[in-house]
């Protein structure tokens, strides 16, 4: 049973990622990993809030390491935590760029950030630094094509 359960989880996670990357007009697959949450519910709420944020989706499409948009999404998550302890990194196959420490932006190379965010698979890593609970959520960017597809759609 344990082996089947683990295999099923892997298959379901892969299917979730495939669905997320197949969004209308999508150009990037986004994976948000939250760690250090005080509890599982908080980790899930924060990860989903980030991945659902239109501003975060637009920033990733624009290859803009706008950590403020990510913190904004974290801030409007209905969860109890201290925003002044939050760290944010952006990652892809081209590397990692640290953009926020202790709830504030830190100096980083815009060139490196653009290089990291030019990839099709982007990882948004958030550490709340307030516990041990983790969560992941998947989504896609918000592109011009998404607006065109949905703006032209008639029911």
Label every PLM stretch briefly.
Residues 1-62:
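A glycine- and small/hydrophobic-rich beta-loop-beta segment
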């Amino acid at each position: 049973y344990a082996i089947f359960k683990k295999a099923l989880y892997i298959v379901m996670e892969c299917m979730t990622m495939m669905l997320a990357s197949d969004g209308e007009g999508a150009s990037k697959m986004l994976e948000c990993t939250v760690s250090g949450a005080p509890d599982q519910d908080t980790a899930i709420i924060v990860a989903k809030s980030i991945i659902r944020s239109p501003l975060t989706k637009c920033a990733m499409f624009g290859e803009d390491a706008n950590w403020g948009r990510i913190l904004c999404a974290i801030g409007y998550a209905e969860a109890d935590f201290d925003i002044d302890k939050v760290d944010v990194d952006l990652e892809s196959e081209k590397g990692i760029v640290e953009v926020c420490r202790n709830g504030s932006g830190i100096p980083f190379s815009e060139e490196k950030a653009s290089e990291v965010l030019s990839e099709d698979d982007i990882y948004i890593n958030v550490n709340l630094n307030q516990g041990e609970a983790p969560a992941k959520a998947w989504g896609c960017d918000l592109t011009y094509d998404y607006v065109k597809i949905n703006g032209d759609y008639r029911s």
